């Protein structure tokens, strides 16, 4: 017997427009109506982003966020955190941010993101998006 239905969001629960469709929302409600099956979200997104998407359809679920670093109950209470401590985080930043190179350090926390070089981040994101646009418009693919 199924006791739990867990779903990722991006590329799974969300449609190509990156939202939960009305049909999917109704399927979740139907699943949740079966009191013996728990529905939860497991995502790389932070809690607020995942919760906002659920709120668009008045859905509730436990959420495993930030690639498993935090778990939240249905009411949004933080249950567990599995995070690097500050000293380990600083060590990682120092190791990867090599002087004289264009090393980009990007860290996700429960409350947002840290980027060591915002200008470099923007340039790399623009280059990535331009490559994606070119690939999307390439008729030979």
Residue ranges with predicted function:
Residues 2, 36, 60, 100-102:
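A general structural motif
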Residues 52-60, 118-122:
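Glycine-rich loop at the start of a catalytic domain that most often binds anionic cofactors/ligands
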């Amino acid at each position: 017997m199924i006791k739990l239905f867990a779903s990722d969001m991006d590329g799974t629960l969300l449609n190509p427009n990156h939202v939960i469709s009305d049909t999917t929302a109704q399927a979740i409600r139907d699943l949740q109506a079966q009191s013996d099956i728990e529905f939860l979200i497991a995502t790389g997104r932070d809690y607020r982003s995942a919760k906002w998407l659920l709120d668009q359809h008045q859905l509730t679920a436990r959420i495993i966020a930030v690639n498993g670093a935090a778990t939240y109950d249905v009411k949004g209470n933080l249950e567990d955190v599995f995070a690097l401590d500050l000293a380990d985080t600083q060590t990682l930043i120092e190791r990867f941010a090599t002087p004289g190179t264009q090393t980009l350090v990007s860290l996700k926390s429960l409350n947002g993101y840290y980027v060591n070089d915002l200008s470099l981040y923007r340039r790399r994101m623009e280059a990535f998006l331009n490559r994606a646009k070119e690939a999307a418009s390439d008729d030979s693919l």
